[in-house]
Amino acid sequence: MNYFAHLTLAQPTAASKVGNLLGDFMRGVDEASLPPPVRLGLRNHRLVDRFTDMHPRVRESRRLFSPQRRRFAGVALDVVFDHFLIRHWSRFYTESLDSVITRDYALLRQGEIFMTEPMRHTTERLVTLDIFRRYQELDQLGEVLDRIAGRIRFANRFEGSIEDIRAHYGELEQVFLAVYPQLRRVVRGASVERGR
């Protein structure tokens, strides 16, 4: 799961939202120095990643990506799973998607004091470009994935992974629809951030 799913599975506080994204920005961060609510959010982030990455259906779905892109299939799956969460939002939640996105953007801005500089830069871009609303469109996902490919520090053939997603869209969607309800139950059951 990528940023939007992590935010969705967080508590509705700035510290929790930041902690639930911080797992992707931990370079140089002393975890012990984080405020407890941020640290709990970070633990929740790790639970979500561990469950998703180890799920047999997710692992098996990596084979749907061409051999030259398979090494980065996990990244592509995280992003496309956010797309599916947005696309199927009303299947899982009663609150409107628009109000959740607006609130999450506001909470991320409130939580800037807890962020590393790279995280602050990324979240500013997320909010300013309204990335989550753009995730509804496959063409936008392709642009996001190609930008990620451009940031990888070594030669790779990850660019164009949207073509693998298009070719196996229905299969990937079914994987998401099977895995996400299980993930929600795991997060609630673990109660990493009390009150789940």
Task: Give residue ranges: language-model regions.
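N-terminal leader/auxiliary helical segments
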Residues: M1-R43, L47-R196
